[in-house]
Design a protein with these regions (language model features):
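Sequence-level preference for short, compositionally simple segments enriched
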Residues: 22-324
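Fungal secretory targeting signals
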Residues: 1-22
């Protein structure tokens, strides 16, 4: 079967229905495959978002519970789209593109053209929805790719195996999300804050593969999160540096014994031990083992950790604060 590479996505199937979601403003679009809404496809509702949407008047899309088998793309012009589901357990956007599938040119589409959800727009928000790539153990297969700035994900699920989430650039905030995968399943060069998220490892591998630019003081920060694993005997690393200056910090995170005592891996490149910026503060649980961690990672003091907040990590030149 041939698939279009790049960001020209076509919805194949959509199934589901919609219920009211928690928002003070009425929805601009309702997605329901049974015909009770305005659209039967999530992508169709995104396409209708006007360029006039703003922080004061976002384009709110309500998605009823259901399994939506489609690819979605929020292009750069589609700012201030709010995609609101009812429950991430019952509202799922899923597809199964793998890197070896062929495009129209007859060549494999590659990793970066596999995402089920491709978010290029700034100021995008998703709540109560799961994004899934169901391709399985086929190599890198993205559930979501994010290139937008000031994007927010609350109470969302992200399911994949390898490279589940590509946060490529910009700033993102993840709150109360569940993220599953095995290898490098949170990766990219963005600045991201993960608050109270559940990280679940389905295979032995690496939680993160950051490619933080040297100019960025922060890369990924995980605060008050939990890390667990599928089965006894499964072992994984907190991260490995995709690029030399990878930055990952875990604050007050509970780690099961899925985490290897050494914590971090140098990607078979000792030179990256001198440049990677890996740190923890107050890790707890069987996987928390400061004394056994690699010597090139850091254990932060309470004073150092106190300075790492949503505001200091994500604020930037525009003082963005996704909590407000």
């Amino acid at each position: 079967m041939l698939f279009l590479p790049g960001r020209i996505f076509v919805s194949l199937f959509a199934m589901g229905a919609i219920a009211a979601a928690s928002t003070q403003s009425p929805p601009d679009a309702v997605v329901a495959a049974d015909g009770s809404g305005q659209y039967t496809s999530v992508q169709d509702a995104i396409v209708k978002a006007p360029q006039s949407a703003s922080a004061e008047k976002p384009w709110i899309i309500l998605v009823k519970p259901g399994i939506y088998k489609e690819l979605i793309y929020a292009q750069r012009e589609k700012r201030f789209v709010h995609l609101i589901g009812q429950d991430p357990k019952t509202t799922v956007i899923t597809f199964n593109l793998g890197p070896k599938m062929l495009g129209l040119d007859g060549k494999p589409i590659g990793t970066f053209h596999t995402p089920t959800a491709d978010i290029d727009a700034d100021d995008f928000t998703a709540e109560n929805i799961t994004f899934e790539n169901s391709a399985g153990k086929v190599g890198p297969a993205l559930a979501i790719r994010v290139d937008g700035d000031r994007d927010i994900f609350r109470n969302c699920g992200f399911r994949g195996y390898q490279d589940t989430i590509l946060i490529n650039r910009g700033r993102q905030y993840f709150e109360n999300c569940t993220i599953t995968g095995a290898t490098d399943f949170i990766f990219g060069g963005a600045v991201a804050f993960f608050e109270k998220c559940d990280i679940h490892c389905t295979g032995s591998g690496y939680v993160t593969a950051a490619s933080t630019p040297v100019s960025e003081p922060f890369g990924y920060v995980f605060a008050h999160c939990t890390i667990s694993g599928d089965s006894p005997g499964l072992k994984t690393y907190l991260g490995r540096p995709w690029r030399a200056f990878a930055s990952v910090i875990y604050l007050n995170t509970t780690m099961s014994d899925v985490i290897r005592p050494v914590g971090w891996f140098n990607w078979d490149d000792p030179a990256r031990e001198k440049t990677a910026r890996y740190a923890e503060f107050n890790s707890t649980g069987p996987g928390a083992n400061p004394a056994a961690r690699v010597t090139w990672s850091k254990q932060l003091s309470a004073a150092e950790a106190a300075k790492i907040t949503v505001e200091t990590v994500l604020g930037g030149a525009d003082n963005w604060n996704p909590i407000n």
